[in-house]
């Protein structure tokens, strides 16, 4: 960057002429290639793919022809109105209601105001003394499973939800490969045809080979209060997804599957989940590991999918699936958000560029990414040129004005087309982004590097959160969040603290964890080529559809009622315990003991209790119990 800037001759003369000529030649051709080739890729993708919010499936989908879509929505400290708006956007999609199953997962076991308000809006009485950890609700014809899990962060919440989904649909997925899992945020508003357009590209389009593993859609920003910051974000979202991700899609795979809008084939995610959920905070060696797996978890999941895919074009961009998310309102919040994104991006970018398996499978994609990263330091070049003109250090004839005009013209032409096609005319102000965005990007990059983990010249800050024998890695991360800076943490203390706690508590697990064996930046080699095409069932593409429509409630999966002994006394250890809190277990134990005492004092005459309980407790309370449950809409 230094030798290519229009610096004063007194400084530029210090550089060797041969080095200057070579680097200027390299910069020119890098810019030329990265300007024209991706632009042509983008044009090709726009010609061959549909763009817009229009309905693509011409026939009417019903309960028998529509694949099952499981929506995972983690929630933590969200506004009730925002959360219910997100839920409404899902259940009101133009998609058969029996084929949608929403898993609303709260990251925390406490029954707080948010939880009660959400249940009330879903039609569940809020006057009950206690609530089970999992509740099934039928809301506007769509099955919604409301769950509470122990607080552990977004990925831990996703892990618990995935395990629950895996149990609910354990029998169905053994015979079918037509279940898709959609990850969205609790503040996202889905477009009405978002689900069916996703399913169309992944499963139902004519001639579809059904080998698509994952797709991401188009995320746009929305705001109640407009400002220059929200305008720049809106233009950046559109340009970054419809241009950059479209180019990546044309090169073989997108490099980021954002958690705000990503649809995965459930069978593929099921194979990769053990690797994605295996990396825990306690296993992080340093800040690089922490940023890679916990700040850039979306990129890390995409990396695993790129390795697991057996061929190119199995991880793509759906340009007809849209959703809206709230834009950041203040500059301080924007810098904090982009700093987090940058650290997650740069660490996973290193992993991607150093993985030879990706170079072999996606050569064009990795080459484009490599070239983009080599010229990242020129983000401030435009401003330096303007400064050189203002200070008369350089004249207009010495600057590549024509080259800059062509760059602006080609990008602006695309933005004009996107604005007209999507009816988002404010993105026609793209020249404003062309001028201001380089400065913002340069500031995000420099600020993120210099403040990574809030490191000072003497090391971490004195108030940096660290793990010890009494503080777990998760608790240290929560402490950093409460202090207002989630990166003010010392990951180097995670492993020693875990080892110390293991020794103290003597809790050596029998299982062998999934660990890296050769490299700290690459996933395990056993991930390579994990994914294969779906099983084709000739003549019965969606077999057992009635089983899908009338899926049993969670409480009835795998016979959650525990066994009964000879006296009809409930035996502990059933799968229902997994959904009981400590307070529920204590009440259960008291009731269990009281029942045993009553039976011991009762004379042994008349028919045995086994006759009453041989079909389970629901057999004796069929009409009364089930009518009450059905009226409330809860299964537990």
From Swiss-Prot:
Topology versus the membrane: Multi-pass membrane protein
Domain of life per record: Eukaryota
Pfam families to which the protein is assigned, alphabetical: Chitin_synth_2
Biased segments, Polar residues type: 607-627
GO molecular function: chitin synthase activity
Subcellular localization(s) per the UniProt record: Cell membrane
Alphabetical keyword list: Cell membrane, Glycosyltransferase, Membrane, Transferase, Transmembrane, Transmembrane helix
Reactions that this protein is recorded to catalyse: [(1->4)-N-acetyl-beta-D-glucosaminyl](n) + UDP-N-acetyl-alpha-D-glucosamine = [(1->4)-N-acetyl-beta-D-glucosaminyl](n+1) + UDP + H(+)
Tissue: Moderately expressed during appressorium formation.
InterPro entries documented for this protein: Chitin_synth, Nucleotide-diphossugar_trans
Enzyme Commission code(s) on record: 2.4.1.16
Transmembrane segments: 23-43, 374-394, 399-419, 427-447
Enzyme class label: transferase
Keyword hit for Transport: no
Ranges for region Disordered: 595-636
One GO cellular component term noted in the UniProt record for this chain: plasma membrane
Phenotype caused by lack of the gene: Increases fungal sensitivity to heat.
GO process terms (BP): chitin biosynthetic process
Assigned protein family: Belongs to the chitin synthase family. Class VI subfamily.
Described purpose of this protein according to its UniProt entry: Polymerizes chitin, a structural polymer of the cell wall and septum, by transferring the sugar moiety of UDP-GlcNAc to the non-reducing end of the growing chitin polymer. Contributes to the production of conidia but is the only chitine synthase that does not contribute to the ability of fungal conidia to germinate. Involved in fungal stress tolerances.
Name by which UniProt lists this protein: Chitin synthase VI
């Amino acid at each position: 960057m230094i030798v290519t800037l229009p610096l004063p001759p007194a400084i530029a003369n210090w550089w060797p002429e041969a080095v200057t000529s070579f680097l200027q030649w390299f910069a020119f051709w890098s810019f030329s290639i990265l300007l024209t080739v991706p632009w042509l890729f983008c044009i090709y993708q726009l010609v061959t793919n549909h763009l817009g919010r229009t309905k693509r499936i011409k026939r009417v989908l019903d309960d028998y022809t529509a694949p099952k879509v499981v929506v995972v929505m983690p929630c933590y400290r969200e506004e009730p109105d925002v959360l219910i708006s997100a839920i409404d956007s899902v259940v009101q999609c133009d998609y058969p209601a029996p084929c949608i199953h929403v898993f609303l997962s709260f990251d925390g076991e406490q029954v707080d105001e948010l939880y009660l308000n959400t249940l009330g809006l879903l039609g569940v009485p809020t006057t009950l003394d206690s609530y089970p950890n999992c509740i099934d609700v039928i809301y506007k014809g769509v099955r919604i499973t409301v769950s509470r899990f122990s607080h552990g962060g977004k990925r831990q919440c996703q892990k618990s939800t995935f395990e629950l989904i895996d149990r609910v649909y354990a029998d169905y997925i053994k015979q079918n490969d037509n279940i898709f899992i959609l990850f969205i945020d609790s503040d996202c508003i889905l477009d009405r045809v978002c689900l069916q357009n996703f399913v169309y590209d992944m499963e139902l389009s004519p001639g579809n080979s059904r080998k698509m593993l994952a797709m991401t859609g188009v995320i746009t920003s929305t705001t109640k209060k407009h400002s220059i910051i929200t305008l720049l974000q809106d233009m950046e979202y559109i340009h970054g997804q419809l241009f950059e991700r479209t180019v990546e899609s044309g090169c073989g795979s997108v490099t980021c599957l954002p958690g705000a809008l990503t649809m995965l084939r459930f069978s593929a995610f099921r194979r990769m989940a053990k690797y994605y959920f295996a990396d825990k905070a306690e296993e992080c060696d340093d800040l690089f590991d922490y940023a890679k797996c916990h700040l850039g978890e979306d990129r890390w999941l995409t990396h695993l999918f790129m390795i697991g895919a057996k061929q190119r074009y199995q991880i793509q961009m759906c340009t007809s699936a849209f959703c809206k998310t709230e834009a950041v309102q203040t500059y301080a919040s924007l810098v904090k958000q982009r700093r987090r994104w940058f650290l997650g991006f740069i660490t996973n970018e290193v992993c991607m560029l150093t993985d030879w398996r990706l170079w072999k499978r996606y050569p064009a994609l990795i080459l484009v990414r490599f070239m983009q990263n080599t010229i990242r330091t020129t983000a401030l070049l435009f401003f330096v040129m303007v400064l050189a003109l203002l200070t008369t250090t350089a004249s207009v004839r010495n600057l590549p004005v024509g080259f800059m005009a062509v760059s602006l013209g080609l990008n602006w032409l695309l933005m004009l087309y996107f604005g007209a096609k999507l009816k988002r005319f404010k993105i026609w102000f793209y020249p404003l982004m062309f001028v201001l965005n380089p400065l913002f990007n340069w500031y995000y990059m420099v600020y993120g590097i210099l403040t990574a983990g809030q490191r000072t010249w003497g090391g971490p800050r004195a108030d940096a959160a660290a793990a010890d024998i009494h503080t777990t890695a998760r608790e240290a991360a929560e402490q950093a969040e409460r202090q207002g800076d989630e990166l003010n943490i010392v990951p180097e203390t995670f492993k020693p603290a875990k080892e110390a706690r293991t020794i103290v508590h003597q809790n050596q697990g029998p299982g062998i964890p999934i660990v890296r064996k050769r490299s700290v930046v690459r996933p395990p080699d056993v991930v390579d080529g994990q994914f294969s095409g779906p099983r084709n069932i000739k003549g019965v593409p969606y077999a057992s559809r009635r089983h899908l429509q009338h899926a049993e409630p969670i409480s009835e999966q795998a016979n959650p009622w525990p066994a009964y002994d000879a006296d009809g006394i409930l035996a502990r250890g059933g799968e229902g315990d997994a959904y009981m809190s400590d307070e529920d277990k204590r009440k259960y134990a008291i009731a269990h003991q009281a029942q045993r005492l009553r039976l011991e004092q009762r004379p042994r005459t008349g028919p045995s209790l086994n006759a009453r309980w041989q079909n389970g407790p629901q057999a004796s309370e069929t009409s009364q119990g089930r009518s009450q449950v059905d009226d409330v809409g809860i299964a537990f």
